Amino acid sequence: SFAEEHGLENYRDAANNVIIRKPASAGYENADTIILQGHHDMVCEKNEGVDFDFLTDGIQIYVDGDDIRAKGTTLGGDNAVAMILAILSDDSLAHPPIEALITADEEIGMLGAFALDCTKLTGHKLINLDSEYEGVLMCSCAGGVNVRGKLPVSFKEATGTAVTVQIKGLTSGH
């Protein structure tokens, strides 16, 4: 495994969450442990009419300007785990103790995060590296929630004239 090849302590739980620990570099031994978090699952979607099996076929990638894209499918990965592995493998970086937390089944409901035994982690500061945009840092909390509600509805026969209203070009925070 990556962790074993780099001489790093590692742990995998029954939900397939992975924790990899890297000791602090010289001079940072007493610093707080930082948890770097990402997820290892992907959205398996393909374009209409594309014959592709995500369990057996390899993603066909190509470069489009500054972007890497996939032919007919989702690209297959977020960059969080790649960033974490790059940090863990670079012995030239000065850093506090690091715990890499790589969770499972984020895309289908954060199942790995919900199943995680947090007592396995020693750090109290977590940086979630799962973001939509390169070069953008979000200060927020990570989480997910499903809400189910019921609203009593009664239907009536439609009368009058249907119209469509469009409002465009306004400045907004969303």
What are these regions (language model features)?
Residues S1, G58-G65, Q166-H174:
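Short, intrinsically disordered, charge-balanced linker/junction segments flanking boundaries
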Residues S1-D32:
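A non-catalytic alpha/beta surface segment that caps or lines the substrate-entry region
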Residues Y11, I19, I35, N128, ...:
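Structured core elements
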Residues Y11-A15, Y62-D66, T159:
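Short, ordered beta-strand-loop transition motifs
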Residues K22, G38, V63, G72, ...:
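Pocket-edge structural micro-motifs
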Residues Y28-I102, E107-I108, F114-T119, G123-H124, ...:
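Active-site metal-coordination/substrate-binding segment of hydrolases
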Residues H95-S172:
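Fold-level recognition of mixed alpha/beta catalytic cores in primary-metabolism enzymes, strongest
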